[in-house]
Amino acid sequence: MAVDFSMRQLLEAGAHFGHQAHRWNPKMQPYIFGTRNNIHIIDLAQTVPAMHQALQAVSDTVAKGGRVLFVGTKRQAADTIAEAAKRSAQYYVNSRWLGGMLTNWKTISGSISRLRKVTETLETGGPGLTKKERLMLSREKEKLEKALGGIKDMGGVPDLLFVIDTNKEQLAIKEANRLGIPVAAIVDTNCNPDGISYIVPANDDAGRAIALYCDLIAKAAIDGISRAQGSSGMDLGASEEPMAEELPANDDAAVTVESDALDPADVAMLAESTEHFELLAAPRGAPDDLTKLNGAGPQIVQKLNDAGIYHYWQLAAMTPEDVAKVDADLKLNGRIDRDSWVSQARGFVEAAAAA
């Protein structure tokens, strides 16, 4: 069964937001819809078919018995990458990429063997070892597990890489290119698409967007496993642990791309608003003057900026749960609610939209 998704899902996840116009890579020009508030807007009409190609490549690779390596070492991608790879019985690197991880697999294999040996020693209680020696082994295991835990069972170089943030993972991509391993990647407007076999133009920073990409790739891998088992003549119904089939949450979840596709004009319209609260690594365009909020002096605004809040639309999208968390994290002592920042922010957003 093909993996279905819609353009609306990409929009709601913020996949259409690129970077500030001055930070762009000119090679991404063909994938840019336009500019809004000095932010490049990615053409999701190209993202949708590109993602379909990447998903098909993943499914085909796994169906043929191949291995997919998820690569994403940035903070907001690390946990999501690991969860998606584990769920789909694939492999991942979510800590620092070690030089030679692909091109010097023999050395990496030696480190993996060491990890297994240390793990076995600790599991047996380390007979004959002093307390200090066991402590040293535990620390060594933690270090090796962090670096190699996601590939310790891979058994060889992968057959395809799925990458989040091609700028950060350049070394991984270069090694894959050197070995002729195809690469499917999320490519933002500030990235170089060279060396990517399956270019998926989309935002590579928003946590919600990253979660969507990883979920789709994981489902494609699971689809490949199902196809492989079906073609081998395996009776899935007779298995002691049959493959779990993920059902849509409702009848609308399996809608096809064509029936839910949005007009490109909607992309520009939604670029000015968002339906969910998120923290940003940097402002999208010029930051808003948050000192206009009741009781928000320069020091408080600096706190908000340091936490990743730069715009009124972020505050306007806050739920009561978001308000409580941010208030507690920044020690604002109830100021967000007390001074009605959310309603004020919504007013500023509406005024800007009407201008």
Swiss-Prot record:
Organism: Methylobacterium radiotolerans (strain ATCC 27329 / DSM 1819 / JCM 2831 / NBRC 15690 / NCIMB 10815 / 0-1)
Listed CDD domains: RPS2 (cd01425)
Name by which UniProt lists this protein: Small ribosomal subunit protein uS2
Gene responsible for this protein: rpsB
This protein's UniProt keywords: Ribonucleoprotein, Ribosomal protein
Superkingdom of this protein's organism: Bacteria
HAMAP family: Ribosomal_uS2_B (MF_00291_B)
Example GO BP: translation
One Gene Ontology CC term in the entry: cytosolic small ribosomal subunit
Pfam families: Ribosomal_S2
InterPro entries named in the record: Ribosomal_uS2, Ribosomal_uS2_bac/mit/plastid, Ribosomal_uS2_CS, Ribosomal_uS2_flav_dom_sf
GO molecular function: structural constituent of ribosome
UniProt record similarity statement: Belongs to the universal ribosomal protein uS2 family.
